[in-house]
Design a protein with these regions (language model features):
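Conserved catalytic-core motifs of eukaryotic protein kinase domains, centered on the activation segment
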Residues: 14, 49-57, 96-99, 148, ...
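Catalytic helix-loop patch of NAD(P)-dependent Rossmann-fold dehydrogenases
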Residues: 62, 98-136
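Conserved Rossmann-fold NAD(P)-dependent oxidoreductase catalytic core, especially the SDR/UDP-sugar
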Residues: 69-111
Length: 168
């Protein structure tokens, strides 16, 4: 059985159970779920969606910490813990250096995103306290004409006003 946590109304659709939750108010009830085998947590405010005011920076950080801490709090209550937690993280962890490829053991940067990622990963690592294998995916921005940052740039490219994104 697949369960998807959503801010929308709870419902059952196409063999998927949608469960309402609100990480900001720490509201989630998993008591009716018999077991959770694994969790995939991709929750967090978009980093490409708004001007980075102080209040939006707070939203970027809190949306990640609140969702992760709420999942941890609810998982602690389950008799049978999941065997795997997969959490989104970000390549924004690393120092800004375009001359050398970054590797996992490289040191954290000193900017806002680096701090967000470090706090987010620390929160995610709480799952290990219960013997839950924890995998954190340090991913970059989503590049698809259907979503993410590229969706916003796609109209510019269609008008032949775009420039190469980078070498990869």
């Amino acid at each position: 059985t697949i369960y998807v946590l959503t801010r929308s109304e709870s419902r059952f659709e196409n063999n998927v159970n949608f469960i309402n939750w609100d990480p900001d108010s720490q509201r989630l009830d998993l008591s009716n779920i018999p077991a959770v085998d694994f969790i995939i947590n991709l929750a967090g405010a978009s980093i490409d969606g708004s001007r980075w005011t102080n209040s939006y920076k707070r939203k970027i950080l809190e949306s990640r910490l609140n969702s992760t801490s709420l999942l941890f709090k609810e998982i602690k209550k389950l008799k049978q813990k999941p065997s795997l937690y997969i959490g989104a993280s970000a390549t924004g962890f690393y120092k800004k250096n375009t001359k050398v490829a970054q590797v996992e053991k490289d040191y954290k940067g000193s900017d806002f995103l680096s701090d967000v990622v470090a706090k987010w990963e620390k929160e995610s690592n709480n799952f290990m306290k219960y013997g839950i294998r924890t995998v954190l995916l340090r991913i970059g921005l989503v590049l698809s004409k259907d979503g993410g940052v590229l969706k916003k740039l796609y109209p510019i490219f269609k008008l032949f006003l775009g420039v190469p994104i980078g070498s990869g």
